[in-house]
Amino acid sequence: MSESRTSADGGMETSYGFREVPGGEKQGLVNQVFHKVAKRYDIMNDVMSMGMHRAWKDAMIAALNPRKEPGYKVLDVAGGTGDIAFRIVEASGRQAHATVLDINGSMLGVGAERAEKKKLSGNLTFVEANAEELPFEAASFDAYTIAFGIRNVPRIDKALSEAYRVLKRGGRLLVLEFSEVDMPLLDKIYDAWSFNAIPQFGKAITGDAEPYQYLVESIRKFPNQENFAAMIRQAGFSRVTYTNYTGGIAALHSGWKL
């Protein structure tokens, strides 16, 4: 489970994959990972999910069911390349406005380029900022989405509290994340794929296995479905549920600010 701890010298430590690092160092280490993979992020997700992330994301947007009306505002966090935001805007009939927030400028650069090619720039705003300290007024958004990003945040509880703060009353939180496989045979297959194949595929694609090794380890350190649902409730959300995808390889968590 990814959480902050107090070290022997009184400082806060958190997990970076299977390593324990000072809390203040994790974000910089994660940034290095995503600077390396930004240009090939979709390929990375294909490798990590065995190609299933596209269907999971489509299911996430179907669950959100964005309103087809002007003024509907969504904050997509850790969404630099725009993959989720583009889907939201299209699903709303190009009525919604999505703010794409990411701490990594390289990822945002890829997203902005793609938005121009898709002629969606008018529906999108790209913001470089930290999920733990959102630069928005309270009650600014109708929905908050984050896909495969929350496990990379050093202080997950802080990010969830910020999500609650910036949502309007009646707003919805949706978190799509790799999770704990709940099928006995599938868990062994996915473990073998994750620790043996994924880093090697990553090295073949990008020339560097290390970012993929971290990403695999970060999945194993992330809270399981029930524990993460409890964290969402602790942040103040109501009607908290989750839906497993592909035997729990990923899970979609939902909560409401009521």
From Swiss-Prot:
Root EC class: transferase
Catalytic activity from the UniProt record: a 2-demethylmenaquinol + S-adenosyl-L-methionine = a menaquinol + S-adenosyl-L-homocysteine + H(+); a 2-methoxy-6-(all-trans-polyprenyl)benzene-1,4-diol + S-adenosyl-L-methionine = a 5-methoxy-2-methyl-3-(all-trans-polyprenyl)benzene-1,4-diol + S-adenosyl-L-homocysteine + H(+)
Keyword Protease: no
Region Disordered: start-end pairs: 1-20
Molecular function terms, GO-annotated: 2-methoxy-6-polyprenyl-1,4-benzoquinol methyltransferase activity; demethylmenaquinone methyltransferase activity
Residues the record lists as binding S-adenosyl-L-methionine: T81, D102, N130, A131
InterPro entries linked to this entry: SAM-dependent_MTases_sf (IPR029063), UbiE/COQ5_MeTrFase (IPR004033), UbiE/COQ5_MeTrFase_CS (IPR023576)
CDD domains, A to Z: AdoMet_MTases
GO biological process, one term: menaquinone biosynthetic process
Matching NCBIfam families: MenG_MenH_UbiE, PRK00216.1-3, PRK00216.1-5
Family note: Belongs to the class I-like SAM-binding methyltransferase superfamily. MenG/UbiE family.
Protein name: Ubiquinone/menaquinone biosynthesis C-methyltransferase UbiE
Lineage: Bacteria, Pseudomonadati, Pseudomonadota, Alphaproteobacteria, Hyphomicrobiales
